[in-house]
A protein has these predicted regions:
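A short acidic, Gly/Pro-enriched loop at the edge of an enzyme's catalytic core
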Residues: 101-112
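Class I SAM-dependent methyltransferase SAM/SAH-binding core
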Residues: 48-102
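Helix-to-beta-strand junctions that scaffold the AdoMet/dcAdoMet cofactor pocket
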Residues: 42, 122-123, 136-137
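Glycine-centered, small-residue-biased loops immediately flanking beta-strands
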Residues: 45, 140
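C-terminal alpha-helical "lid/dimerization" subdomain adjacent to the S-adenosyl-L-methionine
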Residues: 3-7, 24-26, 143-199
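Conserved class I S-adenosyl-L-methionine
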Residues: 1-42, 56-57, 79, 86-87, ...
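A short SAM/SAH-binding and catalytic strip from SAM-dependent methyltransferases
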Residues: 112-124
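A short glycine-rich, Lys/Arg-flanked "PGG" loop and its adjoining helix->strand segment in the class I
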Residues: 126-138
Length: 206
């Protein structure tokens, strides 16, 4: 894992790891079940998932693709690897602890990439998105799933500092960073409607 001087709130995920699957993951289940569908996966596709956590999303991936799944939190990855040992995944998964700001992959390695509930908790979301673009092939799809409102509002402004302290992330203008990065926004869909205000943003590398 590459070291750098960015501050990460990964320590709190050591506390969340034992309870994540039971108490937190269900609120994200709708988005997790949908986020691979826009990729229109083909046999042999190589996918990157950034911020894989305990691997709860990987049960939705077919067995004919290969996935590199990264997370900064080793306690979360321990849970994900345990799932793999138990045979929970059909696809071939390679788990790695890694800082998403400095992805340890060569350019144009992946056919498509997904990142769920991660860009709002990293120190520099635009840097991370640019790194994901770098390692994804031209014309590849990048799917972003995250808690998102176009406008933060008064309650959002009040709640934002507490979200950050709890490791739940900060308000990020995803459409703005998508535009800044030069991605083409193909589609957006509200997901996790009952429990959170989340959106799935489907982008294409031009």
């Amino acid at each position: 894992m590459t070291k750098n001087n960015r501050t990460h709130r990964h320590g709190i995920y050591r506390l969340y790891a034992p309870i994540y699957d039971r108490f937190m993951a269900p609120s994200f289940a709708d988005g997790h079940s949908k986020m691979y569908k826009p990729l229109n996966l083909k046999s042999g596709d190589h996918i990157l998932e950034v911020g894989v956590g305990t691997g709860i999303s990987l049960k939705n991936i077919p067995d004919f693709v290969k996935v590199d799944a990264i997370d900064y939190s080793e306690p979360m990855l321990v849970k994900a690897r345990k799932r793999q040992e138990n045979g929970d995944f059909a696809a071939k998964i390679n788990f790695q602890q890694m800082d998403a700001h400095v992805l340890e992959f060569e350019d144009n390695r992946f056919d498509h990439s997904v990142v769920a509930h991660t860009l709002a908790v990293v120190a520099e979301p635009e840097v991370v998105l640019r790194e994901i673009m770098r390692v994804t092939k031209q014309s590849g799809i990048i799917v972003i799933v995250n808690h998102y409102k176009d406008k933060k509002g008064i309650l959002g402004t009040i709640w934002n500092p507490f979200r950050k302290r709890l490791g739940l992330g900060k308000h990020v203008d995803f459409k703005q960073i998508i535009e800044n990065c030069g991605l083409e926004l193909l589609a957006e869909e509200r997901v996790n409607k009952i429990t959170t205000h989340s959106k799935m943003l489907v982008c294409k590398i031009p």
